């Protein structure tokens, strides 16, 4: 390969790397907030009168359906 082609490829590589970095800016360190949940205080009305396994299955199904229907679908 000629030196011009190599130089052009290196410039293109550096340009694409800089664009990739600019597309994903870092989040500030203070933007992450932790949420503390006290298990005894959590009350789920949908789980009243059923066992722990059934309650876990219902919560999992609800979370899965919520995840499916909040996705961005491009028809």
Swiss-Prot record:
One of its GO terms (cellular component) is extracellular region. Belongs to the phytosulfokine family. This is Phytosulfokines. Transmembrane segments: none annotated. The N-terminal tripeptide (YIY) is the active core. The gene is PSK. Sulfation is important for activity and for the binding to a putative membrane receptor. Deletion of the sulfate groups of Tyr-67 and Tyr-69 resulted in compounds with respectively 0.6% and 4% of the activity. Keywords: Developmental protein, Differentiation, Growth factor, Secreted, Signal, Sulfation. Pfam families: PSK. It comes from Asparagus officinalis. It is found in: Secreted. Promotes plant cell differentiation, organogenesis and somatic embryogenesis as well as cell proliferation. Induction: Expression is regulated by a signal transduction pathway activated by auxin and cytokinin. InterPro entries: Phytosulfokine. Residues 23-66, 72-75 form a propeptide. The modification Sulfotyrosine is found at residues 67, 69. GO terms for biological process: cell differentiation; cell population proliferation. Residues 1-22 form the signal peptide. GO terms for molecular function: growth factor activity.
